[in-house]
Amino acid sequence: MKKTTLISIAVIALMSVTSCCNASPENEAPQVKNVIYLIGDGMGFGAVTSLLLSEDNVTGFEQAPVIGLSETCSADNYVTDSAAGGTALATGTRTNNGFVGADPEGKQLTSILRKAQDKGMKTAIVVNTTLTEATPAAFYAGVTSRKMTYDIAKQFTESGVDLAIGGGFNHFYNRPDSLDLTATLIEKG
């Protein structure tokens, strides 16, 4: 009896594996053309629950084809700040609180934005805060303190981002080091 049961399980398992591997062109997922990565900075389960409970209709949030949630702790603290959280979202790497786009040793990490650029894709950063804020900066900069906003702005000018919409003009113009990064950006088009 045991031998028959084991053979039956093996046959079912083999059929399951081969049916999953029997992909044909019409069953393949379509090629992804564009990716829009929306981040609700600081938007935890409480905020999402409030949204869902406050609306009588189905929200756009609920209609999204893919939704991901992230629960993290930073490399040096149980509670993650937006610099370490943004870095984890941008690079997949845990880092120290306050670090932006850099690992715990201070080495700049490669973000998903840079990987998209390496594949020849156009990239953009659109924020309702400053472009040098920790979360968006984690996609193009690498610094050991989120307060290094002037350095972050300089790294933005070298980032190759095709479109940027956000605040923080004072980090690019009329700076303590007298650099006019707006002129640099205009030169680059």
Indicate where each model-derived feature is located:
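Positively charged n-region of N-terminal signal peptides that target proteins for export
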Residues: 1-4
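Sec-dependent N-terminal signal peptides
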Residues: 6-14
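C-terminal motif of bacterial Sec signal peptides marking the signal peptidase cleavage site
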Residues: 17-19
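N-terminal catalytic scaffold of extracellular/periplasmic and nuclease hydrolases
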Residues: 22-189
